[in-house]
A protein has these predicted regions:
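Mixed-charge (Asp/Glu-Lys/Arg
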Residues: 1-47, 52-142
Length: 142
């Protein structure tokens, strides 16, 4: 995981936010295709819906938020832009392994921030803490 303030670099060039977004989106698409889901991408991103998943004759809308920075040593904060997407998919790297957190968007069309704890907090607090491991089940996992 990259610390706050450090960019993502490739061959000596910092990767743009747009490029990081495409990388995150491809991580999610790869995961969904391996699960045998049908995945569709809108031509434009006017409504902040990155993917449409067809699964069991249902459509599920997804916004992808690729996260490469830690807000402190053990958690990340994800800023969600106003979207009508049902789910927020958040690819993250924990101990050199990539996971996708799936967060149900219960605040549609509102801007908000949600925090996820990536490791045990120093104060051992567990109440009202979003541990990333609790968000690894995708909406197509039965």
């Amino acid at each position: 995981m990259i610390k706050k303030g450090e960019g993502v670099w490739l061959n000596g060039v910092e990767i743009s936010r747009t490029r990081k977004g495409y990388i995150g989106q491809q991580i999610v698409i790869d995961y969904l295709l391996r699960k045998n889901a049908r995945v569709y991408e809108p031509i434009v991103d006017d409504f902040r819906i990155d993917l449409l998943i067809e699964h069991n004759k249902k459509y599920i809308s997804v916004q992808v938020k690729y996260h490469t920075t830690m807000s402190n040593g053990s958690s990340i904060q994800v800023k969600v832009a106003p979207t009508n997407a049902e789910w927020i998919a958040i690819p993250v790297c924990v101990k050199n392994k990539t996971y996708i957190m799936w967060y149900e968007n219960t605040s549609k069309n509102k801007k908000y921030t949600v925090a996820f704890q990536m490791s045990k907090p120093k104060n051992n607090q567990v109440k009202k803490v979003n541990f990333y491991k609790l968000f690894l089940k995708s909406p197509i996992d039965n």
